[in-house]
């Protein structure tokens, strides 16, 4: 059902709980029987590059955290350097709290 809502630009809200990862997966509309959680990216350096390349090469749903002041730079880097503009994206903010923000980007 979440996938149909996503495809039709209908936003659904999770019941806030203990896990931001599970809450985001419950509303994203992506196939989530297989997913990987990558945590936070390193701020800079080789470790960041390695993790970004891992996310890009992952074929299933990928979940990661990013700081609000770095999210635009990270998304830009993923789009420009790694050419992931063809992948759907959902950005969730404050997903386990009352004021939830969900942004959906569909590549098609």
Locate predicted features.
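Glycine-rich, phosphate-binding/catalytic loops in enzymes
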Residues: 1-2, 81
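Class I SAM-dependent methyltransferase SAM-binding "motif I" and its flanking Rossmann-like core
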Residues: 2-58
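A contiguous loop/helix-start segment that scaffolds small-molecule binding in enzyme catalytic cores
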Residues: 60-61, 65-108
């Amino acid at each position: 059902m979440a996938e149909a809502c996503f495809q039709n630009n209908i936003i659904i809200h999770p019941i806030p709980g203990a896990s931001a990862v599970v809450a985001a997966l419950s509303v994203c509309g992506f196939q989530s029987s297989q997913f990987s959680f990558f945590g936070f990216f390193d701020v800079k350096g080789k470790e960041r590059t390695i993790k970004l390349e891992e996310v890009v090469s992952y074929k299933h749903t990928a979940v990661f955290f990013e700081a609000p002041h770095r999210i635009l730079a990270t998304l830009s880097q993923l789009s420009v350097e790694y050419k992931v503009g063809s992948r759907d994206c959902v950005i969730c903010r404050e997903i386990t709290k009352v004021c939830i923000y969900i942004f959906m980007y569909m590549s098609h």
